[in-house]
């Protein structure tokens, strides 16, 4: 589990908003090669690796995504601040007050700043607390001496430059992991650690398994392509959603029965439930009402496979998120148990 936590820290330290994932793809390729694998980078920028199993006729496909929420420069404002366009789905208040980095395409520089509502000062603006947060009043205050559009553009900033959010990753003495982008870098870390263990311990899986690290999940078309024809089961490892009426918590693995795309495959879900009960893996079944995954994207793209979704419980999803090492451990055990099991009947 210590190595999984290390992978989480390393992954969250790399900026990877959807569409700006070259660095994290490079990290994955380098890490997998060091483990002794031969990863393949897809045309879209994802990274895949395959472990040949005892059954090489029917295959499994397991995914986690390493792209995250982010933003992009929409315009340079007359006062030198930046107007934003969001990448991924989240309300503006989820990023208000967050430190950020502008990745300047023309120079390769990284410029720091803070995301704020325009009328931030409560000493000046009566509506500082009541104004609706919208694209028109949310902006980046650059950490540079700029007071107008010309000065900002002189820094090389242009429309289309990506903006990443400070993850602020913290692991507490009580076992909590607090960070942005635990969705879905927790799952990616779990897959990396299992791949490490399988290689070091020379474990042979019962079924040939493709591990896919996707980079477009947050905008709806992650690992929905490059699925080998032999694949019959597709497992997305992604976050479990917490809130009112939810069973998911920060201490168990969450198995999704339905999200916004509809129900997941019943027999596959029950296969996971039986494994969890047999191996005393703490789990919760749940519905994620406003949610889609790589697996649901694959189904929408026409994949003819059994599909399932599970993951660690993530509190305050798409904001400053939190989970606990107990949930990470339960999720890792669940994925491991599945990968060592027979195919779903």
Residue ranges with predicted function:
Residues 1-345:
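N-terminal hydrophobic/helix-forming segments and targeting peptides
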């Amino acid at each position: 589990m210590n190595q999984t936590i290390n992978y989480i820290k390393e992954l969250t330290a790399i900026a990877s908003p959807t569409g700006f994932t070259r660095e994290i793809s490079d990290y994955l390729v380098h890490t997998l090669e060091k483990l002794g694998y031969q990863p393949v980078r897809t045309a879209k920028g994802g990274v895949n690796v395959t472990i040949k199993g005892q059954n090489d006729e029917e295959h499994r496909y397991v995914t986690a995504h390493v792209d995250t929420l982010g933003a992009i420069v929409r315009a340079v404002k007359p006062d030198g601040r930046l107007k934003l366009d969001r990448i991924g789905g989240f309300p503006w208040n989820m990023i208000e007050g967050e430190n950020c980095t502008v990745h300047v395409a023309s120079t390769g520089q990284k410029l720091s700043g803070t995301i704020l509502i325009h009328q931030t000062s409560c000493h000046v603006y009566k509506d500082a607390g009541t104004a609706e947060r919208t694209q028109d009043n949310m902006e980046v205050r650059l950490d540079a001496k700029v007071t107008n559009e010309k000065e900002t553009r002189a820094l090389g900033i242009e429309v289309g430059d990506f903006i990443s959010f400070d993850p602020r990753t913290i692991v507490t003495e009580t076992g909590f992991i607090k960070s942005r982008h635990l969705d879905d870098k927790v799952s990616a870390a779990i897959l990396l650690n299992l791949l490490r263990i399988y290689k070091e311990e020379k474990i042979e899986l019962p079924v040939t398994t493709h591990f896919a690290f996707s980079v477009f999940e947050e905008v709806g078309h992650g690992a929905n392509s490059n699925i080998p024809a032999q694949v019959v089961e597709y497992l997305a490892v992604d976050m479990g959603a917490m809130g009112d009426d939810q069973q998911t918590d920060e201490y168990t693995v969450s198995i999704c029965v339905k999200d916004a795309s509809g129900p997941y495959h019943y027999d596959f879900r029950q296969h996971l439930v039986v494994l969890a009960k047999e191996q005393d893996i703490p789990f919760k079944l749940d519905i994620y009402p406003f949610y889609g995954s790589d697996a649901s994207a694959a189904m929408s793209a026409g994949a003819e496979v059994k599909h399932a979704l599970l993951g660690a419980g993530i509190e305050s999803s798409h904001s400053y998120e939190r989970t606990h090492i107990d949930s990470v451990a339960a999720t890792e055990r669940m994925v491991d148990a599945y990968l060592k099991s027979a195919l779903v009947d």
